[in-house]
Amino acid sequence: MRHQKSGRKFNRTDAHRGAMFSNMVASLFKYQLIKTTLPKAKELRRVAEPLITLAKVDSVANRRLAFARLRNKEAVGILFSNLGPRYVTRPGGYIRLLKCGFRHGDNAPMAYVEMLERPIIAEEVT
C-alpha cells in the first residue's frame, strides 16, 4: 500500500526523476523563468524552495549540501550569490506558478515557473 507516500512519479525511475528535477532547478536559477507542465511545476517547488532557504545562510556546509542536490557549480554560485541574499527577509514562497494554457500535441496543462522579485530586463521598443 502506498499510504502517505507524497510526490508524483511521472512514469520515471527514481534516478531519472531526480536528475530531471536537478536540471530543472538549475535552469530555473539560471534563467529565473522556465516553462514546463503544471504537475512538474508543482513538484519543482518542493525541490527548489528548500534549496533557496538553505542559501539564506552562506556557509561551506550549506554550499556542499546544495551541490550534492544540484550537481551544478554554476547554479550553486547563482543560488548563494544572488538568490540567497535576495530572499533573506522572505519566510518562504519564493516561486510563482502561472498557468499558460495547454500544449499543442498532447493538450498537457502548461505553466511558467517564475522566481519572485526577479529583475525585469526592459526591452527597447522601436
UniProtKB/Swiss-Prot annotation:
Keywords: Ribonucleoprotein, Ribosomal protein
Molecular function GO terms recorded: structural constituent of ribosome
GO cellular component: cytosolic large ribosomal subunit
Gene3D superfamilies, per the entry: Ribosomal protein L17
PANTHER family: LARGE RIBOSOMAL SUBUNIT PROTEIN BL17M, RIBOSOMAL PROTEIN L17
Xref: HAMAP family: Ribosomal_bL17
Quaternary structure and interacting proteins, as annotated: Part of the 50S ribosomal subunit. Contacts protein L32.
Similarity comment text for this entry: Belongs to the bacterial ribosomal protein bL17 family.
Protein name as catalogued: Large ribosomal subunit protein bL17
Organism: Xylella fastidiosa (strain 9a5c)
